[in-house]
Amino acid sequence: MEDKEEGKEENKEGNNNKEKTDNENNKNKNNTSKKFEMTEEQKKALMETFKKMSLARKAREVGGYDDVIKPEYKFWGTQPVPQFNEECKTEFGEIWKDHKVEDLDKEPLTLPEGYEWKDVDLSKQVEMDKLYEFLKSNYVEDDDHMFRFDYSKDFLKWHLNPPGYFPEWLISVVKEDKIKNKKKIVGFIAGIPVKVNIHGTDITLVEIDFLCVKKEIRSKRLAPVLIQEVARRVHMRNMWWAVYTSGTLLPTPFCKTTYYHRNLNVKKLVDIEFTNLPHNMNMARAIKKYDLPKDLPISGFRPMEEKDVDDVFILLDEYEKKHKVHGYYSKEEVAHWFLPRKNIIYSYVRTNDSNKVTDFISFYCLPSSILQNPKYKKLMAAYSFFNINTSCEFKDLMKCALILAKKENFDVYNCLNIMENETVFKDLLFGQGDGTLKYYFWNFVCPKTEPKDLSLVLM
């Protein structure tokens, strides 16, 4: 009995100690709670930090490491495109479905006083000259203001007047110059019809390109008005979808691609600061490293001719179908886009013993003005278009493309990491560029697409 009573006493003392400890713990918890209690302002700031972290992570996923998602997109937040900060109710297909041509405004959007709409007719030399000069002075340039795209007049006419184009989709905004008593272009946007297959669904849509506003008036927010006006005109043709690219991160790309560059004229590229020599390499070693043989590693390539259109059409059609998102062409479009034109498009074919085209190379010419160099005025860049092999190695095919571009006096060969292009970059000494090109659909939700699954080149 004594042992039991003694045990009870010990339990009682233990319970007292436990109660004391619990009280102290509760006291500490209360103190801790009071110590770390946040004000409403602190909570708001913390939530804002979490939001920024989430947006930064999203930017890396859909854009690039240098991309930043803005807290608000005043224009794009109102458009039928997937948004960064909300779940899209549509997993695939149209977002805005309730559309009818008869509900559209028949008149163009209202512009500020002194500005007016004007369609651009590229068959008229005066209008062609005005558009060329406007784009040459105001279109895309790099962040360091060293290079600016310089699309030639012939290139613009080729690109903007394809088979089936609509003249009213080439839109400018003009403003009267009272001193010179003439009207000048201050804004431009273009649309051309294209056919695209998106994960098995064929769609005819508009490719939006050459959105450009004069530098001095960019604060007037003319770009959204240009986009809305070309959209209105496209809708009048009962077309409700668009595809476009941008180096800027917008809501929301379905594919992020990267440019890679292969030096052809090393000395010039270093002189104009397009590229730099590694610390452990002098000019002589660099020239030797990037030197290309005069002869092609594969014999039999010749410039594409009219007689090759049918074969190239079949080759392109079979090749493009291997990709989840791809364009497709009619025979008339194959002839337009791929038959060689000096300083515009270069295409080569290789045939077998039966004179059937088995392999195909193409690249287009897009020079840039060099803005800060007294010696050089123009950078000649070849841009990879479509390259298809069925009877040779892809690496050998692409090496042929480099040699052919070098023979045409191009300084650099540029290539996106789409299709199977990336498989040869290391072996053929391509270097990664410092920017990304994002692909977007307007009013169409497409699953995220890897570059290798994309066969769509927008110029």
Segments the model singles out, each with a brief description of its role:
Residues 2-14, 22-98, 104, 108, ...:
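Active-site/acyl-donor-binding loops of N-acyltransferases
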Residues 4, 8, 12, 18-37, ...:
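Short amphipathic alpha-helix that is part of the acyltransferase structural core
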Residues 147-158, 244-251, 329-336, 415-423:
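Short amphipathic alpha-helical segments embedded in low-complexity Lys/Glu-rich regions
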Residues 174, 192-196, 208-219, 385-393:
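A short, internal acetyl-CoA/4′-phosphopantetheine-binding micro-motif in the GNAT/acyltransferase core
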Residues 213-232, 391-403:
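Conserved acetyl-CoA-binding loop-helix of GNAT-fold acetyltransferases
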Residues 307-321, 340-341, 355-378:
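Membrane-interfacial loop- and helix-cap regions that link adjacent transmembrane helices
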